Amino acid sequence: MKRIITILCLAACLQGAWAQNAVENIRQRYNAMKELIASHSGEADTNGADNGTFYHLTGTFNLPATGFHTEDTYLYFEDEEDPTEEKIYLPHRLTFATTRYNFAPRVYYEEYLYDADGRVAFIYAYDPMMAFDDDEQDMQYEFRFYMEKGRVVKTIVRKKSYDEEAFRNVWQGNQLPKKYERAHSSLVANAAQLATLFKDIEKRTYSYAE
């Protein structure tokens, strides 16, 4: 019995160390990407990245009931090198995406970090009006989901009322609580849509890399 308990404890420790290492790697990649964008944020021609490393899409139109609506999306990419082939035009790989949009006066913001296989590895999202419990008033929420090969390894959820200045933690852990599964699934779907959009743009603007 003691041996089984020891093995289980060891497995739990190894699992925790693996998850922590995955989170740290994601944070390093995320910080490096944000530093790259910030280092070029003053350049009008690049607007946050070196020339040729992003697509910028904007849309503006009127929606029934909510009125004026705008979407502002950046898709950042890098060359995907293949040591087995020599190509003049290297294929591109989506690395990071940001999108800001509104419904009426409410402004939403999301960030997506992708791994080398094209899977979303990190999600940050700000939702200006959300409630998870029947007796809860609408609050402002921040979500951070860290993922390794599609599996959530860390979740951070913060919220604040419209009268509060700072967000406060309501959940932080290595699991994805059931009450936040729907929000997570919706954001993962958004990440997949942006990845598909990137591929469609590449087919039109960078087809000679094939």
Q: What are these model-derived regions, one by one?
A:
Residues 99-125:
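Mid-length scaffold segments of soluble, non-membrane domains
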Residues 63-104, 108:
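Mid-chain, structured segments of secreted extracytoplasmic proteins
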Residues 4-13:
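Sec-dependent N-terminal signal peptides
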Residues 20-78, 135-210:
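Long terminal segments
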Residues 15-19:
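Sec/Tat signal peptide C-region and signal peptidase I cleavage site
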Residues 88-94, 114-120, 146-153:
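Short, solvent-exposed coil/turn segments at beta-strand boundaries
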Residues 100-104, 125-132, 157-164:
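Short, solvent-exposed aromatic-acidic interface loops
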